[in-house]
């Protein structure tokens, strides 16, 4: 593979001998800025029933709805050493992955599964040995089914205690080598998808036409969001009181944030856009930065929105050392005058009072190249939420092609957008491509991949192969490849095709 990278670099030097005014390289980023790529436990590990692991709510949803599963997926559980070698070849600074709660503590509380513990120790050791920073997510859609059956999982505040005990094990066992912890992955979309819409784990809702056996879309969405914040605050407090002085790490919270723009120039749509930002951004950033929910949400949702006690408010406020952002595309916002609800009862969308429409032609799968949407998100966070440290924890586009030129163009543009935001004052400290390799996706399953590396899921050995984007990213991270303009990318596509 190194030989290919060398040839690829020589090719680029002939294809793009000049530099344009907006071309820049890795060296333009601040010292210590992390470039990486990501996966998550259920999407990458496989080995779903091996070595003591028990089902999570993600396993259960997949089997109950017959929508494919992550039983084997990439088989990262057995192939992690091979994958770390690929990370070295790609020149990653960091690798973002999650820990499976149901592998480490299969029943959600109580005894630790020693084989699961050893797997994560081995993975982290392999990363550290090869100079790759572990960036660990503690919860990624997959709490143990045992806790869901026992008391309803996140709809019950008993989850806060069990989550805190689980992360205590993680901090104790891995914290000497892990400096970056994200407690919850994309908390807003996890909550909306899992408890309002019922489309993602654990699949609870009360909307008609949905395949939900349990749930209440009017209340559970907000109860779960509240419990996630309290669980994060509890984990953060534990880390800072017990581990931070010795381990020196930081603890953050993850959100899925779109670039939101009014669909028209009307005042109503402008107001609706700000309301949508309060519901998507402020729902969690408000408590984390200021200690409470936005007034917009409190007025609209009323008694269905839980209330922080004074003590809870103080615990949540300032509990996040950084904000993790998952960002893929933009959306337009249209005001809803009469707040219709499918069920006749209020839910997240009717409460928000806005239609949010994704921008782009999604019939072609890949996402549009629109880096200004990420710039707008980072600027809004800077202006509205005291400019906290930020890591872009997911950014990428799905594609089916091996010669994924559009992904190269997308990554090039969005990384450039991050640099522009930094130059404009955003405290953004890292960028992670989603994903390092093709995975079992939350929505697309195995229909298309986001990976820098393709995975042959029909091959029992799950062969990995570098896409064009892997070579491009590797050369950029080595400082050999400067950013390409659109003309150069088209030439790259043509020349790469002719040389394949």
UniProtKB/Swiss-Prot annotation:
One example of a Gene Ontology biological process annotation: carbohydrate metabolic process
Catalytic activity: Hydrolysis of terminal, non-reducing beta-D-glucosyl residues with release of beta-D-glucose
Domain of life: Eukaryota
One Pfam family linked to the record: Glyco_hydro_1
GO molecular function, one term: beta-glucosidase activity
Gene3D superfamilies: Glycosidases
Active site residues according to the UniProt entry: 186 (proton donor), 394 (nucleophile)
Binding site residues for a beta-D-glucoside: 43, 140, 185-186, 328, 394, 434, 450
Carbohydrate attachment residues: 216, 361, 424, 456, 495
UniProt signal peptide: 1-20
Keywords on record: Disulfide bond, Glycoprotein, Glycosidase, Hydrolase, Signal
Entry EC no(s): 3.2.1.21
Family annotation (InterPro entries): Glyco_hydro_1 (IPR001360), Glyco_hydro_1_N_CS (IPR033132), Glycoside_hydrolase_SF (IPR017853)
UniProt keyword tRNA-binding, yes or no: no
Cysteines engaged in disulfide bonds, as pairs: 205-212
Transmembrane segments: none
Family of the protein in this entry: Belongs to the glycosyl hydrolase 1 family.
Protein name: Putative beta-glucosidase 5
Natural source organism: Arabidopsis thaliana (Mouse-ear cress)
């Amino acid at each position: 593979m190194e030989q290919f990278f060398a040839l690829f670099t020589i090719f680029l030097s002939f294809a793009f001998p000049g530099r344009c005014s907006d071309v820049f390289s890795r060296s333009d980023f601040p010292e210590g800025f992390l470039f990486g790529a990501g996966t998550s436990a259920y999407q990458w590990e496989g080995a779903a029933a091996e070595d003591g692991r028990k089902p999570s709510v993600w396993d259960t949803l997949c089997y109950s709805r017959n929508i494919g599963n992550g039983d084997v997926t990439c088989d990262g559980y057995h192939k992690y050493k091979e994958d770390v070698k690929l990370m070295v070849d790609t020149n990653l600074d960091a690798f973002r992955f999650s820990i499976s709660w149901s592998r480490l503590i299969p029943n959600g509380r109580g005894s630790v599964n020693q084989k699961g513990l050893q797997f994560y120790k081995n993975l982290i050791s392999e990363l550290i040995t090869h100079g790759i920073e572990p960036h660990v997510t503690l919860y990624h859609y997959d709490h143990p089914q045992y806790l869901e059956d026992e008391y309803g999982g996140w709809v019950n505040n008993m989850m806060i205690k069990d989550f805190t005990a689980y992360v205590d094990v993680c901090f104790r066992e891995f914290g000497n080598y892990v400096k970056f912890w994200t407690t919850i992955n994309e908390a807003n979309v996890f909550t909306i998808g899992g408890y309002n819409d019922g489309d993602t784990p654990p699949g609870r809702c009360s909307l008609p036409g949905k395949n939900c056996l349990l749930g209440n879309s009017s209340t559970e969405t907000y109860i779960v969001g509240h419990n996630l914040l309290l669980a994060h605050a509890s984990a953060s407090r534990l880390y800072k009181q017990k581990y931070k002085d010795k381990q020196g790490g930081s603890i953050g919270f993850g959100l899925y944030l779109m670039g939101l723009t009014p669909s028209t120039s009307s005042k109503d749509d402008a107001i609706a856009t700000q309301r949508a930002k309060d519901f998507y951004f402020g729902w969690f950033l408000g408590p984390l930065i200021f200690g409470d929910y936005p007034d917009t949400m409190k007025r609209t949702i009323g008694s269905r929105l839980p209330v922080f006690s004074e003590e809870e408010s103080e615990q949540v406020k300032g509990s996040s050392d950084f904000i993790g952002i998952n960002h893929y595309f933009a959306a337009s916002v249209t005001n809803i005058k009469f707040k219709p609800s499918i069920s006749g009862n209020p839910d997240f969308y009717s409460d928000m009072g806005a239609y949010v429409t994704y921008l782009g032609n999604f019939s072609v799968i890949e996402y549009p190249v629109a880096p200004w949407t990420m710039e707008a998100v980072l600027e809004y966070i800077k202006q509205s939420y005291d400019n906290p440290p930020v890591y872009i924890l997911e950014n990428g586009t799905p594609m089916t092609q091996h010669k994924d030129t559009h992904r190269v163009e997308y990554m090039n543009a969005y990384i450039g957008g991050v640099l522009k935001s930094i130059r404009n004052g955003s405290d953004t400290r890292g960028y992670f491509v989603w994903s390092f390799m093709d995975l079992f996706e939350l929505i697309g399953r195995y229909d298309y991949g986001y990976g820098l590396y393709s995975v042959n899921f029909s091959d029992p050995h799950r062969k990995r192969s570098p896409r064009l984007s892997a070579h491009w990213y590797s050369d950029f991270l080595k400082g050999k490849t400067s950013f390409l303009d659109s003309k150069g990318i088209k030439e790259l596509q043509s020349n790469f095709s002719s040389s394949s």
